[in-house]
């Protein structure tokens, strides 16, 4: 099947399929004589695996590790569990940071008069950065990676 059919069947966009090939997450597709990519059922199964892992929030590096474990029939389930538990810990750190941001914003919004006056603690906080949120800078998304 061509890339459009593989995309439709797997639920992964054509653009992402090309990207996953480029970064080595999936094997490069076979090519027809006219250089069109062709995909088989195994490729689509792998793409579905990748899509589901992304839906669960795994990083590309974690997905590479999971794919290697998936393909290794002699794997130990403890290795897979370790990847999952590490990811759960990351998710819990993100949840805690989001909850802290929510508390901070609720506090600031509660102290903002919300009227015609120009003074507003929300703007002052953003300008001065006095509230501390347990975050670090992610070069791709700005403040999003958690400590």
UniProtKB/Swiss-Prot annotation:
This is Heavy metal-dependent transcription regulator 2. It comes from the Bacteria. PANTHER family: HEAVY METAL-DEPENDENT TRANSCRIPTIONAL REGULATOR HI_0293-RELATED, REDOX-CYCLING DRUG-SENSING TRANSCRIPTIONAL ACTIVATOR SOXR. GO terms for cellular component: cytoplasm. Transcriptional regulator involved in acid tolerance. Binds copper. It contains a N-terminal DNA binding region and a C-terminal metal binding region. Residues 3-22 bind DNA. Residues 1-69 form the HTH merR-type domain. Its main location: cytoplasm. Pfam families: MerR (PF00376), MerR-DNA-bind (PF09278).
